[in-house]
Amino acid sequence: MTRHGKNCTAGAVYTYHEKKKDTAASGYGTQNIRLSRDAVKDFDCCCLSLQPCHDPVVTPDGYLYEREAILEYILHQKKEIARQMKAYEKQRGARREEQKELQRAAAQDHVRGFLEKEAAIVSRPLNPFTPKAASAGNGPDDAQPGSSAGPAGKDKDKALPSFWIPSLTPEAKATKLEKPSRIVTCPMSGKPLRMSDLTPVRFTPLDSSVDRVGLITRSERYVCAVTRDSLSNATPCAVLRPSGAVVTLECVEKLIRKDMVDPVTGEKLTDRDIIVLQRGGTGFAGSGVKLQAEKSRPVMQA
C-alpha cells in the first residue's frame, strides 16, 4: 500500500479549507476575518490613535477622539480640500482656454475658406441633378476630401488611430476632476464634523490617587460619575454634554431621565445632550458591535 491516500492533494473534492487557503494566497476575492478581543479598542481610547485619551473629546455620534489627533485631522482635511479645489480650478481654467482656442481656430478657418472662395477665378456651377442628401446643403464643393461612397469598413479603417503617423496618433486626455466637497467629515461615521461639535469628556478615575500612567496599566480605570459603577467595554455608557461626565446608560434610564437634570452641574438636559458613547465591544457576538472585518479585492469571474 502506498501513502497516496494520506496526502492532502489526494482528495477528489476541493475542500473548504483548501479554497480558503488558496483565496488568501491568490490575492483575489473578498477576505473575511472574525475579530478577537485583542483587535477591539477600549472604550476610553481614541478612534484615530487607538491609545488611551489624555484630553478626550466626543462627537455628536459618540465617537471618542484625542483632541490633538482630531484637530490635526480636521486641519489636514482642510488643507487637502484646498489643494483639490486649486487643482480643480486650474483644470477648469485650462478647459475654458482650450474651448476658446478651438472656437478661435474654427472662426479663422471659416474666414480663410470664405476668402479663398471669393478670390478663386473659376468656380464650378451647382449641379441641379444631385441626390437629396447633396441638395440639402452638401454640394460637391462641400464634400470632405478623401471621402468616398465605398463600404463603411473603409471609412472606419480611415478613422482608426495610427501610432506611426504623427497626425493620427491618439492623444491621452487628462482625467476630469470632480468638484471636491468643502465639508470636513468624521473619519468614523462619515458625517459632517466641525470643531464646535466636539464635546470635552471628563472620566472619573477609579482611584484619584493614581496618576494617568498608573491608570493605563489597569484593566478597570474609570467609574460612573453618579453610581460609581466600573466602566468597561461591557458597560454601555453615555456622556452628558453640559458637564462632560461619563455615566452608565442604566443610570441615565433610571435616574437622569426622570428629571432631565445634569447631576454634576444641575443644568437642564435635552435628549441631544445625552451622547451614547461608542464602545469597542468585548469580542463576544452578543456585545452589539460588528466583529466581522472584510477586505474587498478583485474578483475573477468565468
UniProtKB/Swiss-Prot annotation:
Coiled coil ranges: none
Residues with the Phosphoserine modification: 36
GO MF assignments: molecular sequestering activity; ubiquitin protein ligase activity
Chain positions covered by the region annotation U-box-like: 55-75
InterPro entries linked to this entry: NOSIP, Znf-NOSIP, Znf_RING/FYVE/PHD
Catalytic activity: S-ubiquitinyl-[E2 ubiquitin-conjugating enzyme]-L-cysteine + [acceptor protein]-L-lysine = [E2 ubiquitin-conjugating enzyme]-L-cysteine + N(6)-ubiquitinyl-[acceptor protein]-L-lysine
Any GO BP: regulation of nitric oxide biosynthetic process
Main location: cytoplasm
Motif (Nuclear localization signal): 78-101
Annotated keywords: Cytoplasm, Developmental protein, Nucleus, Phosphoprotein, Transferase, Ubl conjugation pathway
Domain notes: The U-box-like region is a truncated U-box domain. It is unknown whether it is functional or not.
Homology family: Belongs to the NOSIP family.
UniProt function note: E3 ubiquitin-protein ligase that is essential for proper development of the forebrain, the eye, and the face. Catalyzes monoubiquitination of serine/threonine-protein phosphatase 2A (PP2A) catalytic subunit PPP2CA/PPP2CB. Negatively regulates nitric oxide production by inducing NOS1 and NOS3 translocation to actin cytoskeleton and inhibiting their enzymatic activity.
Record's protein name: Nitric oxide synthase-interacting protein
Gene from which this protein is expressed: NOSIP
